[in-house]
Design a protein with these regions (language model features):
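A general structural detector for well-ordered alpha-helical segments in enzyme core domains, enriched
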Residues: 21-28, 49-52, 81-88, 109-113, ...
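Catalytic cores of alpha/beta
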Residues: 46-56, 101, 105-119
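C-terminal helical cap(s) of enzyme catalytic domains, especially alpha/beta-barrels
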Residues: 73-78, 131-153
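Histidine/lysine/aspartate-rich catalytic loop segments that bind and position anionic ligands
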Residues: 7, 38-91, 95
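Glycine/small-residue-rich loop that forms an oxyanion/phosphate-binding "nest" at active or ligand-binding sites
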Residues: 1-24
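Surface-exposed amphipathic alpha-helices with a cationic face
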Residues: 26-36, 54, 86-94, 145-152
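Glycine- and other small-residue-rich loops at beta-strand/loop junctions that grip anionic moieties
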Residues: 42, 81, 102-103, 133
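Glycine-rich phosphate-binding active-site loops on the catalytic face of alpha/beta enzymes
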Residues: 2-9, 60-73, 118-137
Length: 153
């Protein structure tokens, strides 16, 4: 997954602006594909970014779930962010892109995210490792997988 990085950023704070960098990203995508590497672009769940990712020729998009996670405690904002993710995932799927999602996902907010269709992969790391300090890695992973099991895509 290609992600933007800002100076002194501890974690990715937003998605790539694919629409503004189509040519450069298309060249990078082509080189990676020629080396046998499938490409995912980390984007905000906005339709112009989804369309740009398809134009670039990316095989995947990873939808940035940070705003969903950030607003999880506010039902109205959570619903709005979940709607953006659902709309973006549907459009990406229509355009032939495979859909991943990640950023800020945890044991509390993951069940609500499973309303998003067409998800192939979820990128979850910090919360599993944090939980593993208390319960061990095997149990932390089992607990997360149990939350994912009901997903029918």
């Amino acid at each position: 997954t290609l992600v933007p990085e800002k100076r002194q950023e501890l974690t990715t704070e937003g998605g790539l602006d694919v629409a503004a960098q189509c040519s450069a990203l298309a060249r990078t995508r082509r080189r990676l594909n020629e080396a046998g590497i499938e490409v995912s672009l980390f984007i905000t769940p906005d339709l112009p970014q989804v369309a740009a990712a398809a134009r670039v020729g990316s095989q995947f998009v990873e939808l940035h779930t940070g705003r969903f996670a950030e607003h999880f405690g506010n039902p109205a904002r959570r619903k709005r962010e979940l709607g953006r993710l659902i709309t973006a995932a549907r459009r990406a799927h229509q355009l032939g892109l495979r859909v991943n999602a990640g950023h800020g996902l945890n044991y509390r907010n993951l069940p609500a995210l499973l309303e998003v269709p067409h998800l192939v992969e979820l990128n979850i790391g910090h919360t599993i490792i944090s939980r593993s300090v208390v319960v061990g890695l095997a149990r932390a992973v089992r607990e997360m997988l149990a939350l994912m099991r009901p997903y029918d895509g």
